[in-house]
Amino acid sequence: DDILNNKTDGTLNDNFYRALKKRVYIFTWEHFYPSKDYSLFVPTDALQKRVDAFTKDFAPRCVGVHIRRTDNAVSMGKSTTEQFIAEMEQELLAHPETRFFLATDDQREEDLLRSRFPGKIISNQSRTIDRNSVAGMHDALLDLYCLAASDKIIGSYWSSFTDTAADMRGI
């Protein structure tokens, strides 16, 4: 209710932002309201260092790949592994120097892509998959910022995570 009471012209009032506590956790699969403003998304210094450690290897070209497998049946049905592989192969045909940042919740998918595209996959191999843990949330943010730093995103159908990364990048 607080959000609805403080919303005018499709955006939240400045007073509402100022009244927020220092840290806010938002859990949703939908946009709150039509907005492409991600200026409030500011990574902590620790997260930014982790993002920088991965993105330094993105040059000269990096395509983000988001493969969601464990909890989104719609995504799994529409975004097959074969489709991801075909898209990645097309990228390499057009741009052989391309590397891929892989964000996935399925280790088998990562293992398959690493064997299919040796030396081309960048990912957080020490990630925590449990999205309900603090470490898992931190790793998800790392993936989100790295996807948003890529030149292009090949993402999962019906995934707000893919959509948010693309919006953050302006893709």
Residue ranges and their predicted role:
Residues 1-94:
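Secretory-pathway luminal glycosyltransferase catalytic domains
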Residues 66-70, 89-134:
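Catalytic donor nucleotide-activated moiety binding site of glycosyltransferases and closely related
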Residues 75-77, 110-115, 164-167:
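A short acidic (Asp/Glu
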Residues 77, 102, 136-139, 154:
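Aromatic-acidic/polar surface patches that form glycan- and anion
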Residues 82, 119-150:
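Donor nucleotide-activated moiety binding/catalytic core segment of transferases
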Residues 85-92, 114, 150, 166:
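Non-transmembrane alpha-helical segments in soluble domains
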Residues 140-171:
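A donor-sugar binding/catalytic signature common to diverse glycosyltransferases
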